[in-house]
Amino acid sequence: MASRSHTEVRFKFGQNWQRFLSSVNEQRVLAAEKALTTVLGNIRGKTFLDAGCGSGLSSLAAHRLGAHVAAFDYDTQSVACTKELQRCHGLSWRTEEGSVLDANYLTKLGQFDIVSSWGVLHHTGKMYEAFRNIAIPVKPGGLLFISIYNDQGFLSLYWKVVKRIYNTGWFGRVFMTLIHLPYVGGRFVVRKITRRPIERGMSLWVDYIDWLGGYPFEVAKPRDVIEFFAGLGFTVVKTNLVGGSLVGRRSGNNEFVFRKNHDQPERHR
């Protein structure tokens, strides 16, 4: 497994997910199932790897949809969250601690019909290394489903500073949370007016804290992501871009579904 540094600045993702667990109900699970089905279609009988399982909600949704699920996360508390979700629903699938930066670990996992890593790779601190490694457990002909923060240029640099300050201690957390409350308040009002649910069964507040604190933090232009994975032997089959185009500058995650070619070229070094 990739080594942990005691001095590294890293958001406590698992701690945030533990707050979310108490709000996981049938409505949220159904929303997560719908999100997976919309993007991936029928996954019944497929092998499914949740790389960076977080709260475990996506793993649970995939399991209920009939997939054979395995899951891992770098964060110990996130692994605990997923196992608690299993216990609460009386279900079981392979869940363990692991790192997408550990190529040997990913090789030992074997290969899967579907590998999902939603909102994970840009938080590793080595995003392009994570891109290379996440290709390992995808079967030839299999699907890779990822989401990556959109590159907003200067605004992305601003958010990186915000996240770095947030993770300096309690004062940074309180200060950054308070001065950005209008950001989440505006989103809350819009959703109340439009009655639009939170995507993927998530919580607006948990997403807000994850956005403010999520560090390490990297971004990429959609075209760069597509071209990089093409070099790894993948063909893009579906995108959902926050800017609506390959050059959009809105904030949020760009979603990509890639298919691994049977005759893929040599991997990037």
Place the predicted regions along the sequence by residue.
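Conserved alpha-helix/loop element of class I SAM-dependent methyltransferases that forms part
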Residues: 26-45
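Class I SAM-dependent methyltransferase SAM/SAH-binding core
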Residues: 57-102
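A short SAM/SAH-binding and catalytic strip from SAM-dependent methyltransferases
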Residues: 114-126
